[in-house]
Amino acid sequence: MLRSISIASRAAGPVRPVARARTAVGVVAPPRVCCCAPAVGNYGQVDGKATLNSLRRLPAGYRPRSCPSSRSPDVKKVLVVGSGGLSIGQAGEFDYSGSQAIKALRESNIETILINPNIATIQTSHHLASEIYFLPVTADYVAYVLEKERPDGILLTFGGQSALNVGIQLEKMGVLERLGVQVLGTPIRTLEISEDRDLFVQALNEIDIPAAQSTAVSTIQDALDAAKTIGYPIILRSAFSLGGLGSFPHDEEELRNLAAKSLSLSPQVLIEKSLKGWKEVEYEVVRDAADNTIICCNMENFDPLGTHTGDSIVVAPSQTLTDEYHMLRSAAIKIVRHVGVVGECNVQYALDPNSRDYRVIEMNARLSRSSALASKATGYPLAYTAAKIALGHTLRELPNAVTKSTTACFEPSLDYIVTKIPKWDLAKFQHVERNVGSAMKSVGEVMAIGRTFEESLQKAIRQVDPNFAGFEAYWKPEDMITALTNNNDRRLFAIAHAMLNLDYSVDYLHDLTKIDKWFLYKLENIVAVHKQLRSTPFEQLDKELVMTAKKTGFSDLQIAQLTGKTEAEVRTLRKQFGVTPFVKRIDTLAAEFPAYTNYLYTSYNATTHDVKFDNGTMVLGSGVYRIGSSVEFDWCAVTCSRAIRDLGKKTIMINYNPETVSTDFDEADRLYFEELGFERVMDIYDLEGASGVVVSVGGQLPQNIALRLKKAGVQVLGTDPEMIDSAEDRHKFSSILDSIGVDQPAWTEASSLASAKEFANRVGYPVLIRPSYVLSGAAMNVVWDEAQLEHNLTLATNVSPDHPVVISQFIDNAQEIDVDAVAHKGKLLVHAVSEHVENAGVHSGDATLVLPPFSVNQHDLGRLKTIAEKVAQAFQISGPFNMQIIRKPPTGEEDAELKVIECNLRASRSFPFVSKVLGHNFIDTASAAIMDTNVPAPIDLMAQKRDYVAIKVPQFSWTRLPGADPFLGVEMASTGEVASFGKDIYDAYWAALLSVNGMKLPKANSGILLGGDITRPEMTEVAKNLINLGFSLYTYDPKVEAHINDQPYLSIKKILVPVKDKKKLREILEEHEIQTVINMARSRAATTLDEDYAARRAAVDFGIPLINNPKLAVLFTETLEKKFVKNNPIPYSEGFKPSEVGSWRDFVGEAATTKLEGIAWTGEAYCIILIPGIGV
């Protein structure tokens, strides 16, 4: 725990320790015009304004200028730049930070404009910002919005690396100065210094802060030369990039390939001396324009340096630091003051475990992933406070929004320990490298709170995956030494195996892993209790041992597995002993001052409750972000919680994801930062005496325990869990569809391999393997022959051994349609029909969705509505549901075939998309249906004509997953989504495509690499479109070469694609100026020696756009044809506005159907009004 803290204020004199959670004394009033500390040099007073008067070792390009005023009374309109689609390295934490920033602006009566194409986020809901632009977060498009809206200020530090890079570009373009837009908070020059590694090291040298020996380079040869000078081992780090794009090359050839890859994605890389094995420590710092500075939180990585902090287990506060804590704290304050941060930032250190020697790794002068973790770990509203500081407020005048009883100038103090564990989904990808290093690979993270490290860690392990009971030996590698020495996504379980089964000592494990012995001794405590439980018969368990186990973080299921009993039997015994958890409050002050927060957790290391209980309605959140469940389910959970509160009912949110808005302090009457498993939900339900539980807005995780909750006597609100179970079980679901006359593909229950083969031969290949109770298509596969059938059927049954596996006919070349809907007691209230661009066979989460649908006629829309009505009635649905339907186009006068392939009796990932596109909040309607209160009348949104189109495009993170095959199939692979509006499908797709992080359009006369299945009818059409646009076509496949060259007026050249030599492959792509890869392969590569695989992988490795679906390739080329001028995209120019540049209100406007509280700007203050026709 932290023993003492202080508030640093230059005005108050030298830094001195004070009692924790107390403000500094002697803080004097700021000067008439307050200023931030300079990036370099000292400020002096001239005519009441602070100016730079000492130029000592200025970084190149720095221009002395007056310091900005601490207050901005003229700022009445501010543009907030969002982060775009979720990707590895830049995820949902920016929805949280951006949402808090917008709330802070609203409180200050400032009109807020938001640009963010991530339609799944809370911040893009229209009760927050007054205008929202679903446009690319690029300098050009932000400039278009600035031209149109003419704001007074811009906030760049709440949209991650994307927003920061855009701000720097806008400054260089001169747009901000020309339009008179003030950068609020941290100035651009400070952002540049923090991002340019060379300038940052220069700044650190000026104040005698040590940094790792490094050289900034922008070419491959310079990287090789720098490495020779510094000497291996080295680390290669990218500047201006998110999520630590870097790695540890061991020799010249590895460095050459890594530098080429990094320089294709970032303009500069840093070659540093490797400090692998040192401790890694972070400090979150807040500073205002009057130079008041506090440390919000310090965190320590469980894993030593060498693993990206986003992929590390992290604890807060630090546990193994002594005097080093104050040394690094003072250095962080010194750095932040020197470079001139105004707002929030984090400083990362490498600390020698055997001395007080340290190095600064980096500084993020913006809200970051660590900021979100620190904010949730301490209860301190970092993003809210940073936004207020950006408007000129000081820490000492800002109230703490959480405690209501202190100011923001109080440093948080913790009487608990927080553990963060990353969530990797590497097992979903074929050929992926599972090692974990300096390049981030995790897709999400969990945060657990306990009173001991053991309790906190075991909680966090269960939060990562419900299949994990705790610190157990889930991985038993054959080569233990390699598994422990080289970090990977399963090393924690290898350590458990080493300690539980192989009796490795703490000293030996420390030598292998370099993990601090303090942490290893804590793991040894868990192992000791584990062994005691394993050796004690259930009948001999006493209260003392059960209490010890619970205090050490063991779950009921874990104890049951060790004693040979069921979870229910352990729960019954535990309650008989009176061993139940206590509810504790996070007050940010370690209980030193009265503070009545609603931010709660449970612990067995306590003796009293901190709260009284009041029968609220529980809403189960989505848990950790992972592929298949991301920010869209947080939007659903938050929206539902707000709707229930609007009905006058108290809400209880349960979630453990620090990146979410649902875990914000003001989104529910009570927030439990807790597990979403059966045991903990039941504990909270019993303690609170809750009036009911909502399980249908948090994705698959809450659904999986719905039936158990009902059987335990819980009042599950909305659709009956028995019906949920029937829809989740493919066999039961198909039987119900048969009974109501809704068509579906032919199917059978695969009870044996022989019966599966017989079915496949009867209906014909391809067939689809579908296990029950899975999310994002885990283990689903299209099977094209008998050999694949054997392999995939085995894989599927391993995923869900307790549920039957369904094998169904796969309809090739069919269209897929999503139907999102809400019903009440079996009656359909509202529905939306979205059309996939890709044919069936691509997971709906990876598909490109179009709304309103572009090729479904009114007759088929009516038939789809009828199917939705039948399904709602059959399952007696009360709440949200989603269906995926196959549409086989007719061959003659008959109707198109419509076959239901899946139905989820919960909100889907497309609910935010359809709600915002149609202007009707589906979750508000669903919440009314769930609560059976104020249920609206049915409405047919699809019968209304609209003069706009919206397209949702997936965001992939292939670059972060070395070796993974970038192929689209029935198993989901995307990490996020973006969406844009347009007057037609081409405008919308153009904007959505450019919204994808890292998307670079091909230039005129460049090369396109074409490959894949020549039987695809789209291949010839795509080739014709590209040649008409002036592109040169290349292929590596002789079949493609022959096929294209046989067509009139088309030509393609065959080139070599080396499948083993990355260096040679890169040179060939550069030689032929390949700027896009289009691959139409029918199936995933069997090996890494496949040329299609090599081409796809090369595209993502070297930052080349990849189009890997035939239908998508047609839309891509048609869009280029519509949007290119002289075979090139139109660059930004003053006074020009592309047709897709419009706000949500510009496009949706009066098409919105739900009356909802909106925000209007009167010129003096925000007014909360009812806007006719405005929803979402």
From Swiss-Prot:
Positions that bind Mn(2+) 1: 348, 362
CDD domains from the UniProt entry: MGS_CPS_I_III
Residues reported in the UniProt entry to bind Mn(2+) 3: 884, 902
Domain MGS-like as annotated: residue spans: 999-1154
Presequence positions on this chain: 1-11
Chain residues that bind Mg(2+) 3: 884, 902
Pathway: Amino-acid biosynthesis; L-arginine biosynthesis; carbamoyl phosphate from bicarbonate: step 1/1
Residues at which Mn(2+) 2 binds: 362, 364
UniProt-annotated location(s): Mitochondrion
Domain ATP-grasp as annotated: residue spans: 201-391, 734-931
Catalysis performed (reactions): hydrogencarbonate + L-glutamine + 2 ATP + H2O = carbamoyl phosphate + L-glutamate + 2 ADP + phosphate + 2 H(+)
GO terms for MF: ATP binding; carbamoyl-phosphate synthase (ammonia) activity; carbamoyl-phosphate synthase (glutamine-hydrolyzing) activity; metal ion binding
List of residues binding Mn(2+) 4: 902, 904
EC number: 6.3.4.16, 6.3.5.5
Annotated region (Carbamoyl phosphate synthetic domain), positions in chain: 611-997
Binding site for Mg(2+) 1: 348, 362
Binding locations of ATP 2: 770, 809, 811, 816, 841-844, 884, 902
Region (Carboxyphosphate synthetic domain): 70-465
UniProt-annotated binding residues for Mg(2+) 4: 902, 904
Source species, domain of life: Eukaryota
CC terms in the record's Gene Ontology section: mitochondrion
Function: Large subunit of the arginine-specific carbamoyl phosphate synthase (CPSase). CPSase catalyzes the formation of carbamoyl phosphate from the ammonia moiety of glutamine, hydrogencarbonate, and phosphate donated by ATP, constituting the first step of 2 biosynthetic pathways, one leading to arginine and/or urea and the other to pyrimidine nucleotides.
PANTHER family (UniProt xref): CARBAMOYL-PHOSPHATE SYNTHASE [AMMONIA], MITOCHONDRIAL, CARBAMOYLTRANSFERASE FAMILY MEMBER
Protein family (similarity comment): Belongs to the CarB family.
Protein name per UniProt: Carbamoyl phosphate synthase arginine-specific large chain
Taxonomic path: Eukaryota, Fungi, Dikarya, Basidiomycota, Agaricomycotina
